[in-house]
C-alpha cells in the first residue's frame, strides 16, 4: 500500500532531475574533458606572469630600503627586557646597595679610619 503512495512521486522526481541536468544520455565528463584546463597557462603567459611577479617583488624591496634609509635605520631599537620576579629584584637591589656602599666608603669615611688604624697598639703608635 505504501508503494502506491510513492508511485506519482517517482516519475515526477525523474522529470525534475532530467530538467536540472543531472540525468543525461551522454556522460557528463566527456564534455568537460574536451575543454582545455583553465589552470594551465601557455608558456608565454606564464613567463609574463613570472616577470611581473619578480618586478613587483623588486619594487617592494626597493621601497622598503628607501624607507629604511630615510629613517636612518633608527626604527629598530634594542631594549633590555625588564624582569619583575623576586630574584631579579633582589639582584638589582644588591647591585644598588653594593654601588652605594662603595660610594659611601670612598666619600664619607675619614681617611684615618680602616682596619689597620683601629687596632693599633701603643707600641705601634710610638714607633
Swiss-Prot record:
Signal sequence residues: 1-25
GO biological process, one term: adenylate cyclase-activating G protein-coupled receptor signaling pathway
Localization in the cell: Secreted
Family annotation (SMART domains): CALCITONIN (SM00113)
Proregion positions: 26-79, 124-127
Residue numbers carrying Serine amide: 118
GO cellular component, one term: extracellular space
Keyword set includes Signal: yes
S-S bridge residues: 83-88
GO molecular function: calcitonin receptor binding; hormone activity
UniProt key word Signal: yes
InterPro entries from the UniProt entry: Calcitonin-like, Calcitonin/adrenomedullin, Calcitonin_gene-rel_peptide, Calcitonin_peptide-like
Alphabetically ordered keywords of this record: Amidation, Cleavage on pair of basic residues, Disulfide bond, Hormone, Secreted, Signal
Role noted for this protein: CGRP1/CALCA is a peptide hormone that induces vasodilation mediated by the CALCRL-RAMP1 receptor complex. Dilates a variety of vessels including the coronary, cerebral and systemic vasculature. Its abundance in the CNS also points toward a neurotransmitter or neuromodulator role. It also elevates platelet cAMP. CGRP1 can also bind and activate CALCR-RAMP1 (AMYR1) receptor complex.
Family classification: Belongs to the calcitonin family.
Record-given protein name: Calcitonin gene-related peptide 1
Gene name linked to the record: CALCA
